[in-house]
């Protein structure tokens, strides 16, 4: 039976997910805050700015700039806006849900954002829970994993994780997305999934910088592996399950983000490695590079949690203190020797 779904955010990922859900037979409204973008998409049946001229919108997909219309009778609300816009969009959604209260079952809230809120250091599900009270929604699900919109647009096989404190909600969302090229697994470790999704963007900036500087595969593999160790340390300290970080939303997302030219964070790092200045890089990208703001949040979080994150600290120095990339690499390599694992205190169970 078709489900009424509102997808909020008509960037590359929001558009592709809305298209996929429409392909799966659901009734989908894709919302953009920009009326001009909506008019262009309706006229051309494309989202050329984000996805090129080859990608065509499903005929049944409804694009709108009217948030109330998009949310009307929606059983699922999927947030696919940049991290820095999550709170403001949720605040626009709240009064509409309040007006709809009592009309039927509350909607499931889903988000596909990969970042942390600057200032509060909150994960995205925490931001949504703070703005949208329990009486207005069924619960919150996060979808995350190794996924570039460009690959999903061409029906490349893709697997993600649907995570929620409520497994039944995760399973409902899982069923909405599943088809012959898109597969979701469920997980109840929301903390681990969101931390992996956010912090891999920081490491991807570093991976891109190494490529821009001409470093080889050995160096990139070292960065990714030790970067995953940092992500795992902070995640477990926050209460995540260690096994999550060897799953799709951990190492899976890290691999795809650190190795692909589709990754905005990788491309930004690559440009920095080639000598471009950060303001110019961000201006030329024309799209949000989540890892830049996440680096600042992660740097502060590491201090507050007393977690060792030397790679994250090095990337912070490059982005926010104008440190030369080769200098921070040298500093990383000159650190004192230490064991790879602390087997005496290691455990597959969180402390």
Curated annotation (Swiss-Prot):
Main location: cytoplasm
Residues noted as binding sn-glycerol 3-phosphate in the record, renumbered to the chain: 114, 145, 147, 200, 253, 263-265
Pfam families according to UniProt: NAD_Gly3P_dh_C (PF07479), NAD_Gly3P_dh_N (PF01210)
Binding-site residues, NADPH: 12-13, 33, 114, 149, 264, 288, 290
GO MF term list: glycerol-3-phosphate dehydrogenase [NAD(P)+] activity; NAD binding
Pathway the protein contributes to: Membrane lipid metabolism; glycerophospholipid metabolism
Catalytic residues (UniProt): 200 (proton acceptor)
GO annotations of cellular component type: cytosol
Enzyme Commission numbers on file: 1.1.1.94
PANTHER family: GLYCEROL-3-PHOSPHATE DEHYDROGENASE, GLYCEROL-3-PHOSPHATE DEHYDROGENASE [NAD(+)] 2, CHLOROPLASTIC
Role played: Catalyzes the reduction of the glycolytic intermediate dihydroxyacetone phosphate (DHAP) to sn-glycerol 3-phosphate (G3P), the key precursor for phospholipid synthesis.
The protein's name in its UniProt record: Glycerol-3-phosphate dehydrogenase [NAD(P)+]
Taxonomic source organism: Lacticaseibacillus paracasei (strain ATCC 334 / BCRC 17002 / CCUG 31169 / CIP 107868 / KCTC 3260 / NRRL B-441)
